[in-house]
């Protein structure tokens, strides 16, 4: 299943109105608009594309009248109305983990999730799942969460493996001159001084992608184990 995430109602309009048969679902994001206008545009999009795709919508305004970022916990009443009047299949709810919040503000609100679940059932998408503890992740479906976003975890937790590989293969990736320079500057130690020549197998995008993909598969497997094992 291929999902088109954070498709902006205006900037991505051409894409949103194109042939999306290769996608299973799309997040139609009109959250920069006031609530009523958001619902109007989302409802119209559901009417045009709702028979072709599973559509995910965002019921919260992310900016106030002054253009300031808002990060309020989603209200169950508003969420129920949004789903009823737009016809979306899944609603993105801010449950304290939204990426717009600063790090010290991230705190998953299972109570808010369950209040929404009581109104719309298990049709909630959680963004910012990377900041949720493993114990909480195990219980997400009970809270009404049917879809999660974990891209930050995929990027963050796969990065160390790529960094380690690059450091250990500095000469093969960048050549012996760069390796020697980094040793002189103190960024690498003498044990890194292999003197190897750079090689195509190490400085291609494919080589780095293979490392990242391998690590990402492990991360996804970890999430699946939390839910199903």
Where do the language-model regions lie?
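Alpha/beta enzyme core
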Residues: 8-119, 134-143, 150, 218-221, ...
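Active-site clefts of carbohydrate-active enzymes
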Residues: 121-123
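Structural detector of well-ordered beta-strand residues that form the stable sheet scaffold
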Residues: 3-5, 55-56, 125-127
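C-terminal alpha-helical cap/extension of soluble enzyme domains
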Residues: 138-229
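Active-site proximal loops enriched in glycine and acidic residues that flank catalytic Cys/His/Asp
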Residues: 95, 128-130, 152-154
């Amino acid at each position: 299943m291929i999902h088109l995430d954070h498709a902006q109602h205006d900037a991505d309009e051409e894409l949103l109105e194109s042939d999306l048969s290769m996608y299973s679902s799309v997040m139609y994001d009109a959250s920069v608009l006031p609530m009523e206008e958001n619902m109007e545009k989302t409802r119209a999009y559901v009417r045009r594309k709702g028979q072709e795709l599973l559509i995910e919508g965002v019921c919260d305004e992310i900016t106030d009248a002054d253009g300031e970022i808002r990060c309020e916990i989603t209200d169950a009443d508003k969420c129920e109305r949004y789903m009823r009047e737009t016809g979306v299949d899944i609603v993105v709810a801010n449950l304290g983990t939204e990426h717009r919040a600063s790090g010290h503000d991230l705190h998953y609100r299972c109570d808010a999730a369950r209040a929404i679940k009581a109104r719309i059932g298990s049709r909630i998408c959680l963004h910012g799942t990377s900041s949720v503890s493993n114990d909480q992740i195990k219980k997400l479906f009970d809270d009404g969460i049917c879809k999660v976003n974990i891209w930050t975890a995929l990027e963050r937790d796969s990065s160390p493996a790529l960094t380690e590989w690059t450091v250990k293969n500095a000469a093969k990736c960048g050549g012996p001159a760069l390796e020697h320079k980094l040793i002189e500057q103190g960024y690498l130690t003498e044990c890194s001084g292999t003197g190897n020549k750079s090689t195509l197998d190490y400085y291609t995008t494919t080589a780095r992608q293979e490392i990242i993909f391998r690590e990402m598969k492990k991360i996804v497997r970890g999430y699946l184990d939390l839910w199903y094992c």
